[in-house]
């Protein structure tokens, strides 16, 4: 798994993908986003042990060429799951206050629910202008957990 973060600019994805391709690697899955001027990259890289070693050995070259902080770490094979689970989407909006992500994450952890993806944004209420916190999650609920349905 290649993870990288750095100042956003045009061409960054091309440079990182070229780095991987030039060393024989293949990008299987990826998530990338610009947040407040910082561009974050998460890529599942496929390749032989020699290819992955070459990518690891050359990370300093990538860092120097792109000014991003990058590292390669082992990852589970695609579709690997520690336990049988069911996917659910969880969305919510509330008046903004400190600690909302922690509170939701704490409840989910106590239920042994894994957060697969989470996106949060701060919006402005249309009439009052008050800050509204919005979150959208995909979670993996253990198959043995009883879920209330409307």
Report each predicted region and the residues it spans.
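A conserved regulatory-domain signal marking ACT and ACT-like small-molecule sensing domains
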Residues: 1-150
């Amino acid at each position: 798994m290649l993870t990288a973060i750095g100042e956003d600019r045009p061409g960054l994805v091309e440079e990182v993908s070229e780095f991987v391709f030039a060393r024989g690697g293949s990008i299987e899955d990826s998530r990338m986003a610009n947040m407040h001027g910082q561009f974050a990259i998460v890529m599942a890289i496929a390749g032989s042990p020699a290819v992955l070693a070459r990518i690891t050995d050359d990370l300093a070259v990538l860092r120097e060429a792109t000014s991003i902080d990058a590292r390669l770490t082992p990852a589970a094979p695609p579709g690997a799951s520690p336990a049988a689970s069911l996917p659910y989407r969880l969305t919510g909006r509330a008046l903004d206050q400190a600690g909302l992500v922690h509170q939701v994450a704490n409840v989910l952890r106590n239920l042994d629910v894994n957060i697969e993806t989470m996106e949060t944004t701060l919006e402005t209420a249309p009439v009052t202008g008050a800050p509204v916190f919005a979150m959208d999650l995909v979670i993996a609920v253990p198959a043995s957990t009883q879920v209330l349905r409307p």
